[in-house]
Amino acid sequence: MRNFVKKMWSDVVLGVLFVVSGFVKAVDPVGLSYKIEEYLGMFQLSGWSMFSMSLSVLLCASEMTLGLLLLLRLWRRITAVTVTLFILGFTILTYLIYTDPYGGINECGCFGEALHLSNGATFAKNILLLVVAGLHLWNVFRQAKNNFNYRQIGLTVGVLVVAFFVPLYSYFYFFYVINFYLISH
C-alpha cells in the first residue's frame, strides 16, 4: 500500500485538481470567455477577443483531458510534460497578474465562480503545484515505460469526447435553450 501511495499521490492530486478546475469552468464557458477577454485586454491583445469563446472551450476540455489522463495513468510521459508546461504557463501568467502595477485583474478565474482566490494566493498555489508537477515529471520519467497498446487509444478518445462534451453542452444549452426560451416568453 505504501508503494502504491508513493507512486500515485501526484497523479491523484494533479488529476483531481485539473478535472475539478476544468469541470467548474466548463459549467459556464461563457463566463470563462469573459475572463479570457480580460486577460487579452491586459496584454493589449483585445483584437483576439473574438476567439475567447473557442479558447474557453479549449481550455476547459484541455484541463479535463489532462486530469483524466493523469487519473487513468494514460500516456504518462506526454501527459506529465504537458501538465508541467500548463502549470508553468499558468504560473508565469499569475506572476504577471500579481505584479501588475495597475491591478487590472482582481481574481484569476482558476476555479470559475466556485472558488475565488486573490492574485497572491493564486501565485503561491501555482508555485506549489509547479513543485508537485516537477516531482511528478521526475517520477514518471524514472518509472514509466513506453508501452503502446490500443486500449490507451480507446480510453483517450473516450476522455476527449467527455472533456469536450461538457463545455460544448453548457455553451449550446445557454445560447439555444435559455435564449430561445427568453425570446418566446
What is each of the regions a protein language model found here?
Residues 1-2, 6, 137-146:
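Membrane-interface junctions at the ends of membrane-embedded or membrane-associated helices
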Residues 182-185:
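Extracytosolic and intramembrane catalytic regions of membrane-associated proteins
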